[in-house]
């Protein structure tokens, strides 16, 4: 996990690759249990960037556990953020290859912090239709909410100070899996 700190002072390694896999398997089981009566209407939407590979991993777990193909989409929330600083934002584009109307959509992200990303994701998702329900799955919940948002599925709660940051690395985006806390 040498690269995960991105040159910052690593205070703690909180999840290894094996622990991330175990957390995602547990989240996958919890999603199946909670939505057992409507699995055919289930869909996953990863929030760019690291939420997308996490959503694909959860879909892969569900396929292995139940033989069920759950559709996966990618959601770009750039234009829905409330913290744009006036510069031209880099829009990567969403790709949701299914109708969201009437579905139970599980939004997937790597870290839940203030809740602003989740709020922006809900706004972006609701522009595409009216889901029957929206649920939120996160690998890490670090607290410090500014909005009344709570994750339905959490891999690990990691209390942090405001001077610290949580860095998630995934093989698909960073070349290795791991979660570290960096900062003062």
From Swiss-Prot:
Enzyme class: transferase
Pfam families per the UniProt record, alphabetical: Pribosyltran
Gene3D superfamilies to which the protein is assigned, alphabetical: 3.40.50.2020
GO biological process assignments: regulation of DNA-templated transcription
Keywords: Glycosyltransferase, Transcription, Transcription regulation, Transferase
Molecular function terms, GO-annotated: uracil phosphoribosyltransferase activity
InterPro entries: PRibTrfase_dom, PRTase-like, PyrR, PyrR_bifunctional
Reaction(s) catalysed by this chain's protein: UMP + diphosphate = 5-phospho-alpha-D-ribose 1-diphosphate + uracil
Coiled coil residues, start to end: none
Disulfide bonds: none
Residue interval(s) of motif PRPP-binding: 105-117
EC nos: 2.4.2.9
Stated role: Regulates the transcription of the pyrimidine nucleotide (pyr) operon in response to exogenous pyrimidines. Also displays a weak uracil phosphoribosyltransferase activity which is not physiologically significant.
Membership in a protein family: Belongs to the purine/pyrimidine phosphoribosyltransferase family. PyrR subfamily.
Protein's name according to its UniProt entry: Bifunctional protein PyrR
Gene behind the chain: pyrR
